[in-house]
């Protein structure tokens, strides 16, 4: 959708499709009594869960999923692999993985729309197979 909207105003040969080499691990934990008391009188009071996240590179993200014993499934809406598992203190972890499968979809959009190229961030967060994949679509 974003690419289509951009191409209404910008020529394809001027558009770069940026892709991430990291993802976020989301953690939802029920708020403590103290946290609920602090939230009184604010919009946050209507939410029973505290949500936090941390950025993970591709390898570390896959390792966390494996350590949790979580099942990975393809989220066809997000075009990413997804996993969810229960942690301590009634917490729920959720992660949409950036990996070769999700990046291939993004790189395919670049090629299908004749975009100028791709940019990626953050170097060092990718797995070694990603560079062969990028070369397949950029060259």
Question: In which residue ranges do the predicted regions lie?
Answer:
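Glycan-binding loop/region signatures in secreted carbohydrate-active enzymes
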Residues: 14, 19-109, 138
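A general structural detector for well-ordered alpha-helical segments in enzyme core domains, enriched
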Residues: 2-6, 106
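Loop/turn elements at helix/coil->beta-strand transitions in domains of secreted/extracellular proteins
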Residues: 10-16, 113-118
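Active-site proximal loops enriched in glycine and acidic residues that flank catalytic Cys/His/Asp
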Residues: 19, 122-123
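Aromatic-rich peripheral "rim/lid" segments of glycoside hydrolase catalytic domains that contact
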Residues: 77, 109-112, 123-139
């Amino acid at each position: 959708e974003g690419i289509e909207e951009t191409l209404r105003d910008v020529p394809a040969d001027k558009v770069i499709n940026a892709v991430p080499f990291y993802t976020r691990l989301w953690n939802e934990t029920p708020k403590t009594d103290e946290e609920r008391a602090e939230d009184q009188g604010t919009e946050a009071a209507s939410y029973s869960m505290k949500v936090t996240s941390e950025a993970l590179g591709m390898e570390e993200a896959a390792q966390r999923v494996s350590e949790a014993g979580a099942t990975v499934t393809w989220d066809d809406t997000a075009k990413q692999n997804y996993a969810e598992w229960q942690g301590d203190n009634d917490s729920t972890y959720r992660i949409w993985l950036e990996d070769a499968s999700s990046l291939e979809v993004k790189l395919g959009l670049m090629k299908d729309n004749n975009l100028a190229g791709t940019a990626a961030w953050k170097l060092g967060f990718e797995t070694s197979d990603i560079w062969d994949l990028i070369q397949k679509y950029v060259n």
